[in-house]
Regions:
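Short, acidic loop-to-helix structural element flanking the phosphoryl-transfer center
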Residues: 1-17, 25-29, 66
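Short, surface-exposed connector motifs at secondary-structure boundaries
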Residues: 10-18, 77-84
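C-terminal cap/substrate-recognition subdomain and adjoining C-terminal extension
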Residues: 23-146
């Protein structure tokens, strides 16, 4: 996937990366170090803020749908003139999250790329223009689209 990100960075002017995950913020250091060591482009990280000593810990087990919608909407609102390629996987709620965001922001969502990790059914992408999305297995599947 690193090659996909690097090719996007080279291909698109003012390309920026925003990693949104329902993982806890406590993983930030490990995630950012991994991406840096592997040579990924710089990015912002949007992770769940939880604390063990209060009720925010329960958010760790909450459905990621609302969290991801909220985080990505903040980014879309902050950069209303940018076009976005949403990249996720079929393992959790990414297809549903991205479809909802596409419905709300069709002019900003340029592409939706979903790594198919569990033989996902294409019907999950119902309502999205077929030219706007695709399932993929490896990053090399996307290289020709960039």
């Amino acid at each position: 996937m690193k090659d996909v990100f690097l090719k996007c960075e080279a291909r698109y002017d003012n390309c920026a990366f925003h990693f949104v995950s329902a993982s806890p913020f406590q993983l930030y250091e490990d995630l950012s170090s991994f991406f840096e060591l592997e040579g990924f482009p710089l990015a912002t990280y949007h992770l769940k803020r939880i604390r063990v000593k209060d009720k925010t810990l329960l958010q760790l087990f909450a459905d990621p749908f609302d969290y991801k919608i909220g985080q990505i909407e903040r980014i879309l609102h902050k950069y209303p003139k940018r076009k976005f390629i949403l990249i996720g996987d079929s393992g959790e709620k990414d297809p549903e999250v991205y479809i909802e965001l596409y419905r709300r922001y069709p002019k900003q969502i340029e592409k939706i790329w979903i790594r198919n990790v569990n033989d996902a059914d294409a019907s999950r992408m119902e309502g999205v223009d077929g030219a706007k999305w695709r399932y993929f297995s490896t990053g090399s599947d996307l290289m020709e689209e960039i």
